[in-house]
Amino acid sequence: MNKTKVESGIKMANEIEKRERQFLGLPMVLIWGYIAVAIFMTGDGMEQAFLSKYIMSLGFDNSEAGNVLTVYGLVVAIASWLSGVMAEIFSPRRVMTFAFIIWMIFHVGFLVFGLEQQNYAMMMIMYGIRGLAYPMFIYSFVVWITYSSPSYKLASAMGWFWAMYSIGIGVLGSYLPSFSIPIIGEMGTLWSSLIFILIGGLIAMFLVKDKKGEDVEAQRMTKKEMLREFGRGITILKNKNVAVAFVVRIINQLSLFGLVVFLPHVYTADFGFTTSEWLRVWGLMYIITIFTNLFWGIMGDKIGWVRQVRWFGCIGMAVSTLAFYYFPAWSGPNIFVTTLIALMFGFAVAAFVPMSAIFPTLVPEHKGAAVSVHNLAAGLSNFLGYGLASVMLIFASAEVTIWAYAVIYVLGFVLTFFMKVQQPGRQIKTTVNTQSN
């Protein structure tokens, strides 16, 4: 019996040691999950640069193509909100597997019954339902990270997550079609995305060995408790700190989504850029975020999550948003200046990385619900980023619109003073310092 206890203790110690093993904050026990996210998002992102244009080439007008994407975006927002709680109830691995299967089935339906038949209703239905998949896949993995990463290294772990996301959707997903479309065309490229989804999904299913991803709360919950847990994805906003963090997270990416509504035209019509030059500026910014997501994830654990969001995120974005307009307005298409503003913006927007760690830290007993609220805020940031620009430009110039975004980031700066977060690692250090004195 003692031998059994010793073996059990050794096994538990090995599990803890494995979970604590890291590389610059990346939990090695989840490394295949991070790789799965990058590959999966490559497949999901391959269509983003050309799908609306391709739908129009089939004979549909701009508004019809836009409606397909709008329905998709609405479903994505809903799925983003539900994904955290679903992962908590049914386990991250199960929800990721479900999402992977949904993506494959409805993408094939979108291609066969929608695009190939030029059936508008089927495009809306199939592509819309496919919108459930990617948020459930990636945000379930976020819940998995909160389960398996040490709390004092959570921002670093989230930085790696967003870096993998950027590599997938922002870099590979955007650049690969530029090579594949001339060879196999748009439909061939859309079919080829299934390869990346299949590889990413299978990696998540079979190569991530961490058992934390199989925790199933549903087995310990009644149906009433399950419904209450889903409801908590909204009622959790009664927590003042969560509500403030929710608003700050919405503010986070407003410029990232909003500037693309009008700056492409401003850069080409007013500042003397070609379309290719503008795209290179914006593409460079995304490449920079791969590295800055990692940098700020690690730095946040060292200098403090809220402090980083306050000064480098909110103030950084206020300054870099204005720079994105005024620097090229003064210099024209100067490569040094455009590289500088891409660097500034890429550094500032990634400084919000700790927000992914702040939400589950604020409500540690309901991490899934906390992640769901974070995801809802991310979806609203997307929606309101576009919406603010669209509304402002009806009444004001592009210059005034830029200032509106900058002022909102200053508002976010003020709000961070009302966001009280007990950062685990800093608590430990403070306690050690106090005891040593």
Describe the function of each predicted region.
Residues G9-P27, K211-F246, S436-N437:
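Juxtamembrane intracellular "pre-TM" segments in multi-pass secondary transporters
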Residues A38, Y120-M136, I335-A350:
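Hydrophobic core of transmembrane alpha-helices in multi-pass small-molecule transporters
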Residues E47-A49, N241-W282:
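Extracytoplasmic gate region of multi-pass secondary transporters
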Residues S80-S91, N293-W305, L393:
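Helix-to-loop junctions at the C-terminal end of transmembrane segments
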Residues I89-F100, K302-I315:
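Cytoplasmic membrane-interface "Motif A"-like loop-to-helix N-cap segments
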Residues I101-Q117, I315-S331:
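C-terminal ends and interior cores of transmembrane alpha-helices
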Residues M126-M164:
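Cytoplasmic helix-loop-helix junction between adjacent transmembrane helices
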Residues E365-F395:
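A late C-terminal transmembrane helix in Major Facilitator Superfamily
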